[in-house]
Amino acid sequence: MDLFEYQAKELFAKHNVPTTPGRVTDTAEGARDIAAEIGRPVMVKAQVKTGGRGKAGGVKYAATPEDAYTHAKNILGLDIKGHVVKKLLVSEASDIAEEYYISFLLDRANRTYLAMCSVEGGMEIEEVAATKPERLAKVPVDAVTGVDLATARSIAEKGHLPAEVLDAAAVTINKLWELFVAEDATLVEVNPLVRTPDNQILALDGKVTLDANADFRQPGHAAFEDRDATDPLELKAKEHDLNYVKLDGQVGIIGNGAGLVMSTLDVVAYAGEKHGGVKPANFLDIGGGASAEVMAAGLDVILHDKQVKSVFVNVFGGITSCDAVANGIVTALNMLGDEANKPLVVRLDGNNVDQGRRILAEANHPLVIQAETMDSGADKAAELANK
């Protein structure tokens, strides 16, 4: 679960990570009141779970409460990369001498934790990695020994932070590691971590991702879930325990097994290159033991995505037999009625494939097109999405 910045800063405060005071609001009047309470210039910051807020006009400096009110009115309702701003963080502005970068994350490729630190903060870390790789330190972290003050200082040194701030930076880095472990996070990122003119270290912006698999031992994390900010299709999928991630393409994808679904995304993206650049619209894995009802629920989710122009169902029958999948498709189409108005390309193979294909053939639904192979199915789905 990705957190809003204000939620990340709540965790910073909980774990004694130094940051600037502030509060969240959903009105311009609230922004003015918070600025008046702080009594100093403030930053008015859009709360959206995406980058590029500053370039989109979602982060503004306000010298007075009235300035905060004006900026808040302009930012609320702003569309930033498809995310509509509904909340604002109003926090005390800080004098900045230098900007740094620090993060902890899971390094899945090497099956370890990783600290990343750079003296080049305040810019996209991908840009630093591409243009100044020598300025970005990547330090593996032992899960058993963790990050004590000495290790934290070493991370700061490797990130080329100035000698005069190493001790203060080490304390903050150590606290961020404690947060990372205690909250079962998969990412804790501060960009920028700043040095003030009097050599204080402050976390001015924060990004935290929590591991949903640890929810059973983190009951407090439920309070961070914002259903208003979650895509309604993802909420609908979650209600049916479907593994669904919305993407930005036009071809809906359903498969059984994460590996097959990932392969299907690649094949559809490749096919889309010759059909107007269409792309996959989602990741949806119905799992290894899915029933007809689960298949129907998956189709219900995808067919309600307005971006979807066609659907590719790619199933290799194993535990989930092809006849169960076929019955699920027929059930979903009957249930949706006139709401089902997008072509479905279906490729079935494996357990009970003949029965599955026969069920679809006998149903003779005008929207269903059967494909023999994954490649031909992906090509047909991409072609239909481009019409």
UniProtKB/Swiss-Prot annotation:
Signal peptide extent: none
Catalytic activity: succinate + ATP + CoA = succinyl-CoA + ADP + phosphate; GTP + succinate + CoA = succinyl-CoA + GDP + phosphate
Top-level taxon of the source organism: Bacteria
EC identifiers of the protein: 6.2.1.5
Binding positions for Mg(2+) per the UniProt entry: 191, 205
SUPFAM superfamilies: Glutathione synthetase ATP-binding domain-like (SSF56059), Succinyl-CoA synthetase domains (SSF52210)
Pfam families: ATP-grasp_2, Ligase_CoA
Cofactor names: Mg(2+)
One GO MF term: succinate-CoA ligase (ADP-forming) activity
Residue span, ATP-grasp domain: 9-236
InterPro entries xref list: ATP-grasp, ATP-grasp_succ-CoA_synth-type, ATP_grasp_subdomain_1, Succ-CoA_synthase_bsu_CS, SUCC_ACL_C, Succ_CoA_ligase-like_bsu, Succinyl-CoA_synth-like
Role summary: Succinyl-CoA synthetase functions in the citric acid cycle (TCA), coupling the hydrolysis of succinyl-CoA to the synthesis of either ATP or GTP and thus represents the only step of substrate-level phosphorylation in the TCA. The beta subunit provides nucleotide specificity of the enzyme and binds the substrate succinate, while the binding sites for coenzyme A and phosphate are found in the alpha subunit.
Family named by the database record: Belongs to the succinate/malate CoA ligase beta subunit family.
Name the record gives this protein: Succinate--CoA ligase [ADP-forming] subunit beta
